[in-house]
């Protein structure tokens, strides 16, 4: 029975990974199902505590404490603002999902499959956003007033910029620190170009105040030369950005 639940848990984990950048509804449903499966396993083995001990052995102590702190902060926010009840429930579900994911994705092969699903989700999202940009280019291209059309997919523009920034950090990490073939490097570079383009046409502040500092940190770890190249790319590249993007940048400060 345990094996069947573990197998089902891994399948749901893959679905969860595929939905991260593509569907909030499926993400919430699969995340809740993961928690339910984890709860069932804990209850079935409540006396022997085998599942609980396995979970503790697989979780990094410091990271687990970090997630528990996030849960505590969420409760504090809820106490201050009672109107955020629904939002709090979603946040708690997302934070707690970390633990069943750690339990069900417990081998190198499973990790690779989950990362593949996560990457596929990001690629689908970027391509969909590109299609939306092409379809609505005339609206995006308007420069009158201070209301700017922002490209997004499946969520509000601010949240989308945030998740794509996180996805891009993963892609840069693979490029900088993982051993990859020439074809894989080309694919990663193409994804980086597409991701940066989507972040720019999204016209959100996230690309400037979150993504760039995080990327600068990765470059600093990689080498001083990489960090210098990033700074030059930002300074020089900004001068060549279209007016439609530069105008949005003036509202960041």
Question: Predicted segments — roles?
Answer:
Residues 1-82, 109-119, 175-186, 225:
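Transmembrane signal-anchor hairpin modules in multi-pass inner-membrane enzymes, especially those
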Residues 25-47, 88-99, 160-168, 208-216:
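Membrane-embedded alpha-helical segments of multi-pass membrane proteins
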Residues 63-72, 82-106, 122, 126:
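Aromatic-anchored transmembrane helix interface
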Residues 16-17, 75-76, 93-96, 112-142, ...:
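Alpha-helical transmembrane segments of multi-pass inner-membrane proteins
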Residues 42-52, 101-107, 127-134, 203, ...:
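Juxtamembrane membrane-interface segments at transmembrane alpha-helix termini
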Residues 149, 239-253:
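Flexible juxtamembrane loops connecting transmembrane helices in multi-pass membrane enzymes
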Residues 86, 135-148, 152, 252-253:
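Membrane-interface amphipathic/re-entrant loop segments adjacent to transmembrane helices
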């Amino acid at each position: 029975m345990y094996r069947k639940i573990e197998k089902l848990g891994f399948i749901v984990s893959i679905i969860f990974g595929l939905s991260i950048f593509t569907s909030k509804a499926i993400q919430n449903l699969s995340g809740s199902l993961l928690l339910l499966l984890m709860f069932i396993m804990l209850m079935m083995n409540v006396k022997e505590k085998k599942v609980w001990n396995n979970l503790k052995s697989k979780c990094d102590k410091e990271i687990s404490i970090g997630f528990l702190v996030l849960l505590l902060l969420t409760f504090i926010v809820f106490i201050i603002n009672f109107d955020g009840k629904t939002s709090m429930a979603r946040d708690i579900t997302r934070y707690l999902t970390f633990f069943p994911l750690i339990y069900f994705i417990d081998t190198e092969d499973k990790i690779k499959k989950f990362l593949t699903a996560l990457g596929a989700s990001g690629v689908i999202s970027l391509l969909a956003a590109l299609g939306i940009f092409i379809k609505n280019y005339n609206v995006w291209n308007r420069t009158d007033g201070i209301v700017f059309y922002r490209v997004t997919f499946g969520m509000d523009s601010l949240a989308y910029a945030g998740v794509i920034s996180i996805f891009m950090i993963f892609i840069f990490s693979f490029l900088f620190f993982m051993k990859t073939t020439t074809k894989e490097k080309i694919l990663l570079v193409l994804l980086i170009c597409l991701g940066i383009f989507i972040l720019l046409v999204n016209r959100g502040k996230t690309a400037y105040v979150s993504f760039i500092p995080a990327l600068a940190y990765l470059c600093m770890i990689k080498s001083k030369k990489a960090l210098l190249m990033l700074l030059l790319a930002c300074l020089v590249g900004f001068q060549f950005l279209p007016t439609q993007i530069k105008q949005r940048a003036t509202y960041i400060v």
